[in-house]
Amino acid sequence: MITIAVPMVISALITNVTNLIDNFTIRTRLAHAVSENLDFFKETFSASLLGSGTLDKDIGTYLYGCYFSALDFKNLITSITMSLGVSAIPALAAAVAMKNRKEVGSTINSVIRICMIVAAPAGLGIAALATPIMTLLYGGTNAENLIPISSPIVMIYGIATFVLALSTPLTNVLQAMGRADIPAKTVAIGAVIKVVCNFIFVGIPELNIYGATIGTILCYLFIIIANLYFTMKVSGCRINFISTIVKPMICATVCALCAYGTRMLLLNVLTFGDPSSRLNGANLSTLFAVAVAVVVYAVGMLLIKGFAYDDIVMLPKGKKIAKALEKFHLIG
């Protein structure tokens, strides 16, 4: 128990300390970049800075606030996949204890697939509708001036969501197999990558706050590649990348394109309302686009048999739904 608990505590400690250092490096490097290139920043973000009444001395703080507002979207999806990873620990631990290699492999693949089924469409959908979603939430409020700055960050993290979303579930998988020491090491290395990237990229005026996304993505990319490798090595099982990653990504890409296309078409039809109000054609177009994207994704996954029987069973009345879908050969 101690051999599992200690690495888990260390891993959590490293993550929390890294977040503190991460915030500190972003703020300090951004402040340095602004002080050295004040005119560049005033010109680049002139509309938002003037609209918000931001003083020259507060530009760095304002830009960090814009970055922080975009993190809610990044954390929303990862919090869902985090719970999926935790819920799989008992079943996986039992399979490992019984040395049931087939069940271990099946559970690992199921965890990754379900996370991707949730994260891929949500992330790419948010990326495709980043500005409209931000406008829906912040338009007509005191925070609307951050939309032009925050939207690109939301889009970048949306595209990279599948990378961020798989990190914690893979950590849970390794912990369930009794190798909690591995995530602790990969998280530590990832933390170093993140801090170094922040120091380099955030300090570049042309990248500024957007440079923080580079460090985050490279950090988590290293963590999931390393954890995937050790997951396969420790379990002795292979990951079916076609069913777990490729199929959800294909359908999610189509889903995102449909969301974007639907909104662009509806903008020409739903032209009512004041743009500064929440109740207008543009916002309604965004909501319709999201609904269409959900339907397109679900139908697409069924057509290419992207859902597995075990995935459907976990839903309310899942067994009945799974049996019905099996009759039409719509699940893998």
What is each of the regions a protein language model found here?
Residues 264-332:
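Membrane-proximal transmembrane or re-entrant/amphipathic helices at the cytosolic face
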Residues 127-161, 273-278:
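Interfacial segments at transmembrane-helix termini and the short loops linking adjacent helices
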Residues 23, 217-267, 295-313:
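C-terminal transmembrane helix end/exit motif
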Residues 159-189:
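Membrane-interface junctions at transmembrane-helix termini in multi-pass inner-membrane proteins
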